[in-house]
């Protein structure tokens, strides 16, 4: 039997690369598959001159794709998990993830190797409030300016001198073969916790599509799927948006236990709080919710 799958994705070079990685995985288990990539322009792609938190948040990168899924114009959607809100339409599910790439951020700068080395009042291009929060924690004198666009366009803006530096995700740079050690420098977790789900490619389907669910079960990287549960539970409980400084990073302590570092901030009060939870994989979601409750309480003091 020949399968035919319509795969929805954004039009960016990175999104198309990630979609092809999903296709490669599916072909290992369903070799006779026919597939059609359906590139979709999202609202987030169209509006480039404003910060995401002013126009509706990262959900704008999913809205049109999820609608196509609900309308049965596509069979599955491929996303960067970091762009997926904690709460998605109830008729859809994240049915699979690929193995997580290194989720660290990268300091991209032509002259300096770290945020600390930048000259006084230097300009860093970044539209993410998470990154802005960490940058200001490290160097309060630096100016953080709105910096939108795909990876290639942001690097070009940097090369053209529009900013002194920017921060990008290592996973995207690696997949685009754009990590250049001459001007790309990894930032350690101790200095900047990653975005929730960073480095993970996610597959979203309709909840009632049993055929697609069976396919997704075959490609799902279970250790990554378990690893992101406390991060996603934290995000879902807080129903956080792009105005909320939020971060989390999970790692395995052994095959049954996960440690997750969380960060939550409040832009109005400029408060930031950190918390760590260690949990068995069977209760990892509860750990994310517990962390959210503790940290909300700390911010309210």
Swiss-Prot record:
S-(dipyrrolylmethanemethyl)cysteine modification, residue list: 242
Gene: hemC
Example GO biological process: protoporphyrinogen IX biosynthetic process
Enzyme class: transferase
Domain of life: Bacteria
Cellular component GO terms held in the UniProt record: cytoplasm
UniProt pathway: Porphyrin-containing compound metabolism; protoporphyrin-IX biosynthesis; coproporphyrinogen-III from 5-aminolevulinate: step 2/4
Descriptive protein name: Porphobilinogen deaminase
Additional notes on this entry: The porphobilinogen subunits are added to the dipyrromethane group.
GO MF, any single term: hydroxymethylbilane synthase activity
Co-factor binding comment: Binds 1 dipyrromethane group covalently.
Cofactor: dipyrromethane
Endpoints of the signal sequence: none
NCBIfam families (alphabetical): hemC (TIGR00212)
Self-association state and partner proteins as the record states: Monomer.
InterPro entries: HemC, Porphobilin_deaminase_cofac_BS, Porphobilin_deaminase_N, Porphobilinogen_deaminase_C, Porphobilinogen_deaminase_C_sf
Function: Tetrapolymerization of the monopyrrole PBG into the hydroxymethylbilane pre-uroporphyrinogen in several discrete steps.
E.C. code: 2.5.1.61
Family classification: Belongs to the HMBS family.
Catalysed conversion reaction: 4 porphobilinogen + H2O = hydroxymethylbilane + 4 NH4(+)
């Amino acid at each position: 039997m020949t399968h035919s799958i319509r795969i929805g994705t954004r039009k960016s070079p990175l999104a198309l690369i990630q979609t092809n990685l999903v296709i490669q995985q599916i072909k290992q288990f369903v070799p006779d598959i026919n597939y059609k990539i359906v590139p979709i322009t999202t609202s987030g792609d169209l509006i480039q001159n404003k910060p995401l938190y002013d126009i509706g948040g990262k959900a704008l990168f999913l809205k049109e794709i999820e609608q196509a899924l609900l309308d049965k114009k596509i069979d599955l959607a491929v996303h960067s998990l970091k762009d997926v809100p904690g709460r998605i339409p109830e008729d859809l599910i994240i049915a699979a993830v690929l193995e997580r790439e290194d989720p660290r951020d990268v300091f991209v700068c032509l002259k300096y190797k770290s945020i600390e080395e930048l000259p006084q009042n230097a300009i860093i291009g970044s539209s993410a409030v998470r990154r802005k929060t960490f940058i200001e924690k490290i160097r309060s004198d630096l100016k953080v300016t709105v910096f939108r666009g795909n990876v290639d366009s942001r690097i070009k803006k940097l090369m053209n001198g529009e900013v002194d530096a920017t921060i990008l995700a290592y996973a995207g740079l690696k997949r685009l073969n754009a990590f250049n050690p001459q001007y790309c420098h990894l930032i350690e977790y101790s200095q900047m916790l990653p975005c929730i789900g960073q480095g993970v490619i996610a597959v979203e389907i309709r909840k009632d599509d049993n055929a697609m669910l069976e396919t997704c079960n075959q490609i799902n990287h279970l250790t990554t799927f378990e690893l992101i549960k406390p991060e996603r539970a934290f995000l879902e409980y807080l129903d956080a948006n792009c105005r909320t400084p939020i971060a989390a990073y999970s790692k395995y302590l052994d095959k049954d236990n996960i440690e997750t570092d969380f960060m939550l901030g409040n832009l109005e009060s400029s408060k930031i709080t950190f918390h760590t939870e260690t949990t068995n994989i069977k209760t990892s979601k509860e750990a994310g919710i517990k962390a959210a409750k503790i940290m909300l309480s700390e911010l309210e003091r």
